[in-house]
């Protein structure tokens, strides 16, 4: 019986270590910083969506670097968050559709 208790504890410990390493791998799998992918996150408010506005275009503000964005008030360090002009096209009020009851 003593052997089974030790093996169950060992198995649980190994499973927890495995989960820990998977979490670490997922946390740091963002890729290299020098890749050419430009990810821009834009926050569009819920009110804009409910008013029927749609995202029309994104334009970077003052792109001065060939491989990225650099602004006059910043040094040459890597810019993580990039500002963009967001142009919303207004399609008018959304029409209210009453729920369909079966």
UniProtKB/Swiss-Prot annotation:
Homology family: Belongs to the RGF family.
Originating organism: Arabidopsis thaliana
Tissues showing expression: Expressed in roots and sepals.
Modified residues annotated as Hydroxyproline in this record: 99
Lineage top rank: taxon: Eukaryota
Keyword line: Differentiation, Growth factor, Hydroxylation, Secreted, Signal, Sulfation
Additional note from the record: 'Golven' means irregular waves in Dutch.
Residue ranges annotated as propeptide in the record: 28-89
Residues with the Sulfotyrosine modification: 91
Disruption phenotype: Shorter root hairs.
Protein known as: Protein GOLVEN 4
GO cellular component: a single term: extracellular space
GO biological process, one term: regulation of root morphogenesis
Signal peptide: 1-27
Any one GO MF annotation of this record: growth factor activity
């Amino acid at each position: 019986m003593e052997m089974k208790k030790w093996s169950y504890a060992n198995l649980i410990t190994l499973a927890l270590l495995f989960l820990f390493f998977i979490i670490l791998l997922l946390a740091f799998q963002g890729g290299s910083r020098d890749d050419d992918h430009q990810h821009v996150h834009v926050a569009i408010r819920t009110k804009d969506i409910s008013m029927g506005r749609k995202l029309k275009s994104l334009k970077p503000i003052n792109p001065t670097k060939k491989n990225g964005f650099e602004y006059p008030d910043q040094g040459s360090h890597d810019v993580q968050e990039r500002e963009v002009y967001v142009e919303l096209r207004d399609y008018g009020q959304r029409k209210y559709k009453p729920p369909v009851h079966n």
